[in-house]
Structure formats: structure tokens, C-alpha cells
Amino acid sequence: MKPPDRPTPGRTDRILGVMGGMLRACAVPGQEGPPERDPLGPGSTKTESDCIEEDQTGQREPEVLAWAPQPESYSIAVSEGSMSASAVSGLAALSGPSSGLSSDPCSPIPPGPVTGLRRWLDHSKHCLSVETEAESGQTGQCENWTLGPTLTTGQELPELTLLTTLLEGPGDKAQPAEEETLSQAPKNEEEQKKMALERSMFVLGELVETERTYEDDLGQIVEGYMATMATQGVPESLRGRDRIVFGNIQQIYEWHRDYFLQELQQCLKDPDWLAQLFIKHERRLHMYVVYCQNKPKSEHVLSEFGDSYFEELRQQLGHRLQLNDLLIKPVQRIMKYQLLLKDFLKYYRRAGKDTEELEQAVEVMCFVPKRCNDMMSLGRLRGFEGKLTAQGKLLGQDTFLVTEPEAGGLLSSRGRERRVFLFEQIIIFSEALGGGGRGGAQPGYVYKNSIKVSCLGLEGNLQGNPCRFALTSRGPEGGIQRYVLQASDPAVSQAWIKQVAQILESQRDFLNALQSPIEYQRRESQTNSLGRPGGPWVGSPGRMRPGDLAQASMHTPINGSLPSLLLLPRGEVSRVLLPLDTQALSDTPQTPHDSPALPTVNTPPCQARLAKLDEDEL
């Protein structure tokens, strides 16, 4: 009778051949090492009586393939997921009377095709394990090997899963497995989205939990140090300087305690509100910029009294952290917001949610820390007689090798390293002084020179060098002073050239706008408190990126938490979102140009006064 075709003859035969050699090695203890290939090829056969005779005498002919599968002994035919009777009887004959193998599992009529196959595979595994123990010095002979109950019905061998799958045939199990894989593909995608959503909620929970901890830390400063100092008084040498130590941290604490923390907790019920929460309070977060601007002065005062007066207060209050460790918390927190928002955005996008507003929120929280860092650098600038806050927003700062003009307007023979600050109204050249406080971590700067934007000129790519450019200053008598700047990176130089060119272009636009003041006022009203021009952001109508000069629509409010400052045409009434304590909606129907309304928040009366913080308090 012709044996049935095998599903995958090449790969299956190779695996079966190796498996047969392993079984043959188990049945013949005298054979060690890998079997030798038969020179006669796979067609040579050996009778069963010859095999038994060789086992008894211990002799074998070298030209006979000892491990080759034999048609009458243990050849395996796979068809419809079952083993043939000849294969089962061959296994029974292979075990022999002295091997101790029971003939029941390998009887010509097995209990079931899969059960018989599993027992056959288990016998192979058991033989190999016993052989390993014998080689390691333990006693035991091959004749005494028995098939113990190591495999129960329904249990599979993990090491032999691939082989079991190949031997089950193409009938009832192969095709359903493929169909199951195809049917599980969308299910796995849904599970991945569900898992990503769970991770995003975990990040949101971490944001809320760390916000509570942050509020407690600020409370130790306001309700601990500041309250105690107000009750007991301060030393004479510290009187009048205690406000420099704490800055506006009380305003930050009250806003987080009475409003922001409660809003974050509501986001646990509605995660989509998280992005709007940060976008809405972009202007309120300007408190951190003011705090960071005062931070270098606070460090200077704290360095004089930190080891004496404030240490006594810490021990009196029983606080674990020192005051300078608590005062750095707002700086760390404003950086933490952007990291948590980025993680939330990553998982929320994987969950298939709309992340357009989240991307805007991340951009806001990347811009605010940059402004904070700039203000901390400016707080360490000494020797400038003017008021830095009157010079407009800080557009950039970098270190250059500057060749400055000397007496007579001639350039110096060598360049000097300078820290250059670019404002809207002035460019300041300063020299780094090294460590700026205790520990020398932050450098201080001393003022050297400056150029007013009204007298500024630009020469880019000097001598074809992309790292070099020149800034010129027109003197009161018509003379020109020239500063040659060389950056370490061409990208830095080109960014400065572009930024200065935009400033000069804006200056020309301003002169042209003098002929039309109303149009100029409309354009300037698109700038919010952080100095970020309004306009379309990428993927977001009504907002723009920092430094973008595109003019925004006059109908688009910049910040929903504040009244609109835009000039509207006569007769047009637009609904304006007021601060939370005075929010009122107009009865006039909303025009197509109005911005979408933000979710209504029930604000307790204790929170209302925080919404009245004006520009001077910030």
C-alpha cells in the first residue's frame, strides 16, 4: 500500500531523521557521538533481525546506516494527523524486551493519534535526560529505562512544540490555525490600543499625584517659613530682603491649591480636557517666568542666611528638606509638566485618540520652560544700567567669539568670548564670570557693550564663512561700529542671521505702519503675555509658533481664559470668554468667526480672586 503524501516532505523528513537517530542512540547504549552518514545512501536498509543480533553482540557493520529510518521497524507515515500502524509497531519493536518499555502505548491500535505521538515524544525526552544523568556520574543503565508518567493527557512538550505542529498534518489543525491568526489580528490591534490608553491614564494619574506632592512642598514654604517669619519677625539684616527670597511663590501656591489641582483631578474623568487646561492657562503660567527671573537674587540672599537663620527655622518647623531644596521645586515642576505631557501624548496617540490639541499643549509647555531658563540667565547679568524688562522679550542667547571695535573704530586684533543676548529692543554683549553662586553651578555675566535695534545693521556670511556675521551700530554722529561674531556651529550663526533679519523687517514694517495706526494696533494685539505672536500653528487654526511673523485673523482670540483684546468692527458682537469669576456669555448668537467655547468649570468663590491677577502681579 502506498503511504500517503507528507505535507512538507523536506523539512519534516529532516526533523524525523534527526529524531530517529536520537531514539536509536537511546536504544543502543554502546553508540556514542553523532551517527555516521551511510555511504550507501538513504536507500540502504537493514532487517529487524540483524538489528537485534547486533545489539546482542555489540558489533555493527561500518557500511550500514545505523540511524536511518527503516520501513519495517520505525518508519513514520503522517496522514490526517495520525500515525500508521507500522510506525507504532516499529516503535514497540525498537524498545525491545529488555528496555522496559510497555507495549501498551505502542500497540497497533493506539488510544488516539495525538496521545500516541505525545507518548512517543515523551519517551525520547526521557531517554535523553537519563543519558545525561549517566554521563554526569550517576548510576543507571539503558536497560532499566522506563517510561514514567511524566506527561499527562492534554499536556504538551514546550521544547518540541514545533515538531508536534509539523507532525499533526495539514488536515484539521493547520488551516484553522491560520484562520485564527487572521481573526486575532484586529483583536490584537484593539488590545494594543486598550493597553496604550491604560498607560496614558497611568501617566495622567502620575501627573495628578505629583501635583498633590508639589502642592504640599509649596505649602511648607508659604504656611511654614513665610507664616512663621510673619509671626515672629525677621532679623534686622534680612528685613526688606525676605520678599526677594520667596519671590511670587505665594501666588503660585494659591493658584495651584485653589484651582489647578482641582482641574487636573477633573481630567481623570475626562482626559480630553487636559490639553485645553494647559493651553487655557498659558498666560497664568507666566508666574513661573517671573519666579525664575528672581531666582538668582533669591539664591544670593539665601547664601548669606541659609546656614544660620533659615536652618534654625527648618529645625523649628521639623521639615526634612532645607529651604533652598524647596525653593527649587517650582523650577523642577515647570520642566516636569512637559515630560509628562509628552508621555501622555505618546500613549494617547497610540490609543487612536485625537491629539491635535495635545500637541499644542506640549508646545506651550516646551516654550514656558525656555522662557524661564532665559529669565534665570538674565537674573545673573550684572552691570547693565537699564531695565531689562523694558527691552522686550528675550529672543535668544548664545556664546560667540566676538571681535569688538577699539578706540578709533578699529577692530581688535583678537576675538573675545562673549555671551550675547538678543532682545526685541537691544543686543547685549556680556562676559562670563564663572560660577554664579554657592557651588559654582551657574555662571554670572557682566555687561560689556550693547547695540540698540533702532541703530542696528546686519552683514551675513562674512568672507563666505557661514559661521561669521557682523552687527553694526550707527553712532549719534554718523559713525559706524562693527562687531564681528563667529559661532562654533553654522546652524547657530544662520539662526541668528535669520532672527536679526526678522527684527529689521519688523522695524521697517513699523515705520510703514505709522501711516496706518489702526492696522498696526490690530497686528500688535495678536501677541500674548509670553510674547508669542498669534497666528496659525501647525494643525491648529488661530495659533502660531514662536518667531513666526505671519499675521493672524483679527477674529481669533489668543487665550480663552482672558478677555479678547482684539478690535472688532462696529456692529459686530463677539462672545468673549472672561475669567472664571466673571464669565458671562453674550445672548447674541455666535458668529462663524468666534472661537469654540471651553468647557464650563464650577469654580468655588475662594478660587475667584486668583483669576484677578493682573499683569503687574504676574
From Swiss-Prot:
- GO function terms (MF aspect): guanyl-nucleotide exchange factor activity
In residue numbers, the region (Important for binding to Rho GTPases) covers 317-338
* Extent of Polar residues compositional bias: 584-593
Q: In which tissues is it expressed?
A: Highly expressed in excitable tissues, such as brain, heart and muscle. Elevated expression in hippocampus and cerebellum.
The record places domain PH at 387-505
Q: Describe how expression is induced or repressed.
A: Transcriptionally up-regulated during myogenic differentiation and down-regulated during adipogenic differentiation. Protein levels up-regulated during retinoic acid and dibutyric cAMP-induced outgrowth of neurites.
Q: Which GO terms describe its cellular component?
A: myofibril; plasma membrane; sarcomere
Show the PROSITE patterns listed in the entry. Answer: DH_2, PH_DOMAIN
List the coiled-coil residues: none
Q: Where in the cell is it found?
A: Cytoplasm, Myofibril, Sarcomere; Cell membrane; Cytoplasm, Myofibril
Start and end residues of each DH domain: 199-375
Q: Where is this region: Sufficient to bind activated GNAQ?
A: 506-532
Region described as Disordered: spans on this chain? 26-63, 169-193, 521-556, 584-604
Q: Sorted alphabetically, which Pfam families does this protein's record hold?
A: RhoGEF (PF00621), SOS1_NGEF_PH (PF22697)
Q: Sorted alphabetically, which CDD domains does this protein's record hold?
A: PH2_Kalirin_Trio_p63RhoGEF (cd13241), RhoGEF (cd00160)
> What Gene3D superfamilies does this protein map onto?
Dbl homology (DH) domain, Pleckstrin-homology domain (PH domain)/Phosphotyrosine-binding domain (PTB)
Kindly indicate whether the keyword Nucleus belongs to this entry: no
Per UniProt, the keywords (alphabetical) are: Cell membrane, Cytoplasm, Guanine-nucleotide releasing factor, Membrane
Task: Fill in the domain comment.
Answer: The guanine nucleotide exchange activity is autoinhibited by the PH domain.
Stored PANTHER family: PLECKSTRIN HOMOLOGY DOMAIN-CONTAINING FAMILY G MEMBER 4B-RELATED, RHO GUANINE EXCHANGE FACTOR-RELATED
The function of this protein is:
May play a role in actin cytoskeleton reorganization in different tissues since its activation induces formation of actin stress fibers. It works as a guanine nucleotide exchange factor for Rho family of small GTPases. Links specifically G alpha q/11-coupled receptors to RHOA activation. May be an important regulator of processes involved in axon and dendrite formation. In neurons seems to be an exchange factor primarily for RAC1. Involved in skeletal myogenesis.
Summarize the subunit comment: Interacts with activated GNAQ and GNA11. Interacts (via the DH domain) with POPDC1 (via the C-terminus cytoplasmic tail). Interacts with RHOA, CDC42 and RAC1.
What is this protein's record name?
Answer: Rho guanine nucleotide exchange factor 25
Q: Source species, please?
A: Mus musculus
- Output the lineage of the source organism: Eukaryota, Metazoa, Chordata, Craniata, Vertebrata
